[in-house]
Amino acid sequence: MAIGMSELKKGLKIELGGVPYRIVEYQHVKPGKGAAFVRAKIKSFLDGKVIEKTFHAGDKCEEPNLVEKTMQYLYHDGDTYQFMDIESYEQIALNDSQVGEASKWMLDGMQVQVLLHNDKAISVDVPQVVALKIVETAPNFKGDTSSASKKPATLETGAVVQVPFHVLEGEVIKVNTETEEYLEKVK
């Protein structure tokens, strides 16, 4: 199905030249002279590169053949990550470039969304909020009470986030995976 210029918006998935993209930013421009156009930044699902593209009135792009499947992350083995389709129990292996930044939030057994393009896995999305255990952080010192102060904490997946001083090693915290920010302690 063709997508017209007027339908473009942030987050929309499009296909150009057989490559699936996600619109990460767009701006509708109405110059004083000439026809209106849309200037967009689009990110490739295949290699993660962001390019700037201009769409003019009448331009059309295709809707990509993308399917999102819920899969369970099993384990990391060298340079591959093993996943299992929770419906068919079929297992697939993805490499570092396919998993990308999601790897620093994934725990064995976690359910993730795997994006397929023409039945080939191209990316992995983790939940927006995950609960992870702190394995290393600086100890608290008397007087560390300023609410604005933060310290680095290493999580069980290896990711490092900034946490308030009152958070201790061994505690489980919730983290926003998009902003990589501490949200709260898990009680």
UniProtKB/Swiss-Prot annotation:
Keywords noted in UniProt:
Cytoplasm, Elongation factor, Protein biosynthesis
Q: Which GO terms describe its cellular component?
A: cytoplasm
Q: Which SUPFAM superfamilies match?
A: Nucleic acid-binding proteins, Translation proteins SH3-like domain
Entries under SMART domains matching the protein: EFP, Elong-fact-P_C
Q: List where the protein spans the membrane.
A: none
Q: What Pfam families does the database record attribute to this sequence?
A: EFP, EFP_N, Elong-fact-P_C
What is the first-listed, main subcellular location in coarse terms?
Answer: cytoplasm
Q: Name one GO biological process term.
A: peptide biosynthetic process
- Where, per UniProt, does this protein localize? Cytoplasm
Molecular functions per Gene Ontology = translation elongation factor activity
Q: In which pathway does it act?
A: Protein biosynthesis; polypeptide chain elongation
Its biological purpose is as follows: Involved in peptide bond synthesis. Stimulates efficient translation and peptide-bond synthesis on native or reconstituted 70S ribosomes in vitro. Probably functions indirectly by altering the affinity of the ribosome for aminoacyl-tRNA, thus increasing their reactivity as acceptors for peptidyl transferase.
- Family note: Belongs to the elongation factor P family.
Q: What is this protein called?
A: Elongation factor P
Which classification does the entry list for the species?
A: Bacteria, Pseudomonadati, Campylobacterota, Epsilonproteobacteria, Campylobacterales
Q: Which gene encodes it?
A: efp
